[in-house]
Structure formats: C-alpha cells, structure tokens
Amino acid sequence: MKKADPPASEPPELEALWSSWLVDLGWQPSEPQQQQLQQLYSLVMAGNRTQNLTRITDPIDFWEKHLWDSLRGLRLLGSWDEIQAQPWRGIDIGTGAGFPGIPAQIALPQAHFTLLDSSQRKIAFVQEVLQQLSLAQARAVAQRAEIWGQDPQERGSYDLALARAVAAAEICAEYCLPLLKVGGRAILYRGHWTEAEAQTLKRALSLLGGKLIHVEAFTTPHSHGMRHCLLLEKVAPTPACYPRPPGIPKRQPLGQDKRR
C-alpha cells in the first residue's frame, strides 16, 4: 500500500471529542498520539479503495466504533495509570484492519503487540500502517490462531490477549487462553451478551484453564449502542490439546450444553 496522496478523505477533526475520552477512559491522547490516530483513519480509508477493510467510513462513526471502542475495553484492566505502568506483551487475535491492536499500541507505547490475522492481504496492509505510524514495537503476523497457539515460542508467552468481532466467546477463549501466561488476561469485545452465552463460556473456560472475572456493559458515546466487554484470566496451564487444529474450534465449539 502506498501513502494516500491525496488521502481518500481528510482525517477527522477530532479535537472536540478527545475531552470525552478523559471521562470514559481516564485518558486523553497527546498531540502526537492524536496525529497518529487521525493518520490511521486516512490510511484505512485509502486502503478501503482496494480491499474491504471496513464499512465504517464516516469520521465520527470511525472515531466511536473503531478508536473509542478499541480502547474502552482496556479499562477492564484497571485505571489508565495502572494500565500504562505495565510493559504488556499483548496479542490482537483476528486483527483485520488493525483493531483493536493499533489503537492499543498507540495508547500504550510501552507495550509490544502482535497483530494476528489469517488474511495475508490484511496483514500486508497492517504492516504498512505500522511502518507509516512508526510503531516499531508492534508486529503483524499472517497466521491462524490455532497454529499460533501451538507454536512453542508463542504459547504461554503473552500477558494480554484481545479479540474483537472474531467469533463466539467460547471460540475466542480457545484462541486466547493457550497464548497467555498463567495470570495473563484476555478481553473479549461483544455486542449484546446473555446469561446463556455466559454459561457456555464458563464451561469452555473450565477446560482451558481460564476464569470469567468480569462482564462490563456500557453504551457508546455517539450512537448509544450497547456493548459488553468480558475480562478473562488464565488461572491454570491450558492442556496441550488446545487450541485444536484449524477450523475445529468453530465447527465444534467448547462448552456446548450436550443435554440440549
């Protein structure tokens, strides 16, 4: 991907919106971070010309549904001061066009994120974005989560895993938990959330060495859409059989109630 010249559309003028982040996130981007986030918008819009990266193109919708939403989930980890104090080794599973991993990397420059996706084209785009935004502490990798989770160098090596708009929660858990250290945490981004889904997830977590710590419900600031974020913790080593081979987690999800 070449630099947009001119960009697909001008970066959104978001200065008036940053103040709301202090209320919702307990954090505001610095001027260089604002510039990176605005440049991210321009790069995604330019990339959208040649591949289907996102249907969200309105500047305000992009700010809310990609930038704000990506960072809102991190609040489950504690106050922003506490979050920024940790040198996270994180992974964004199913990153797509780079969300939530790129906003998280911009907001947490002390962290080192791996952005994982099975699509070679999307990862090529994300690699170019990381280069143009000078995010040298992040890397983008084209690989399936099931294979990455069985790689001896990657398995059990992450402090934090993020999964947004990837699959059902129990499937995301099978992708995330094997990659975490014991004590590591995963944040699953959901829309609506039901008690039935929670019970399925808990059954899956009992097999994976994980625990559901917290579910937080909130509404988005502009469109007032309902969101839920789930905080998982790895409390025991994940059995070596997980994640199962590619495709099986989606075809045969863990935690299904066999009595039904």
From Swiss-Prot:
Keyword list, A-Z: Cytoplasm, Methyltransferase, rRNA processing, S-adenosyl-L-methionine, Transferase
MF-aspect GO terms: rRNA (guanine-N7-)-methyltransferase activity
Top-level lineage group: Bacteria
Location (main, coarse): cytoplasm
Keyword Plastid: no
Top EC class of this enzyme: transferase
Subcellular location: Cytoplasm
KW Amino-acid biosynthesis (keyword) present: no
Binding annotation for S-adenosyl-L-methionine: 94, 99, 117-119, 145-146, 164
InterPro entries: rRNA_ssu_MeTfrase_G, SAM-dependent_MTases_sf
Name of one Pfam family that matches: GidB
GO cellular component: cytosol
EC number: 2.1.1.-
Gene3D superfamilies assigned: Vaccinia Virus protein VP39
Segments crossing the lipid bilayer: none
Family affiliation: Belongs to the methyltransferase superfamily. RNA methyltransferase RsmG family.
Record's function text: Specifically methylates the N7 position of a guanine in 16S rRNA.
Name by which UniProt lists this protein: Ribosomal RNA small subunit methyltransferase G
